[in-house]
Design a protein with these regions (language model features):
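Juxta-kinase regulatory segment immediately upstream of eukaryotic protein kinase catalytic domains
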Residues: 1-15, 231-239
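Conserved structural core of kinase catalytic domains
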Residues: 41, 55-59, 70-122
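Conserved hydrophobic alpha-helix
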Residues: 69, 125-132
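Catalytic-loop of the protein kinase fold
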Residues: 134-144, 149
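Activation-loop N-terminal segment of eukaryotic-like protein kinases
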Residues: 149-162
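C-lobe/activation-segment region of protein kinase-like
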Residues: 159-242
Length: 242
């Protein structure tokens, strides 16, 4: 076995830093770079061959979405290596960054709703999501927990720079041109904002306004807005029914 293969086939020196329903995330040094490893679980309830095939397809879709997002001008972690047999993606660890959810929790409250701060967040998220959707990239889990703010201090707030907003966790991402999928992606964001950041109820409307400004195909954007209203209505009906 070659030296790089030995390194690639174990987690020695990597620290488990997160675990979700689909994967474990490790942090360590790979080829001299601070690196994250995302390792997808085996699903024991599925047939082994089916599980292997579905997991490989999911990893390929995730990597494809990350690469396309970067090509669209959206900041994402760089992919270093992919090991389909080990169900792993080795990717860049983003330094000097804070999760957007934590940033909002720290900086914004009901008493101190800073328009400059909210406009900065709306400008960043609205622009980034418009870039993704304009290239038919559906994130699938667009929440403030899946956005990092990089190199942010008080001097940066109010000065939107594309690379300040880094989109992470493309585990549910796919490529799809339908207005329905884009509308649902937006609705997921709206629901997450209302749940996690009820102190800023107008944030989504600000994001949606910027999104419409930056979506490249204006005629399709009108269709997305219309479809979003339908999706929103369906969601409200489900909430009422329970």
């Amino acid at each position: 076995m070659l030296p790089y293969e030995k390194m690639f086939n174990n987690m020695n020196g990597f620290e488990l830093i997160a675990q979700g329903a689909e994967a474990r995330v490790y942090k360590g040094i790979y080829l001299g770079k601070l690196t994250l490893i995302k390792e997808r679980f085996e699903k024991k309830y599925r047939h082994a061959d089916l599980d292997k095939r579905l997991t490989k397809d999911r990893i390929k879709a995730e990597c494809r979405a990350i690469i396309r997002a970067k090509a669209a001008g959206v900041a994402t972690p760089a992919i270093y290596l992919v090991n389909l047999e080990r169900r792993c993606i080795y990717m860049e660890y983003i330094q000097d960054a804070i999760i957007l959810k934590d940033f909002i929790d720290e900086k914004v409250s009901k008493e101190t709703n800073d328009d400059r701060l909210l406009n900065f967040i709306a400008q960043g998220l609205g622009t980034v999501i418009a870039k993704l959707h304009s290239k038919n990239i559906i994130h699938g889990d667009m929440t403030t927990s899946n956005v990092l703010l990089k190199n942010i201090d008080d001097d940066h707030i109010g000065k939107y720079v594309a690379n300040n907003f880094v989109i992470i966790d493309f585990g549910l991402a796919h490529i799809e041109s339908s207005v329905e999928d884009k509308a649902v992606d937006l609705y997921v964001l709206e629901r997450s904002l209302l749940s996690a950041h009820s102190e800023v109820p107008l944030l989504f409307s600000k994001i949606f306004e910027i999104y419409q400004e930056h979506y490249t195909n204006k005629s399709q954007c009108k269709e997305i807005v219309s479809k979003y209203k339908e999706v929103q209505l369906r969601g409200r009906k489900r909430l009422m029914i329970g």
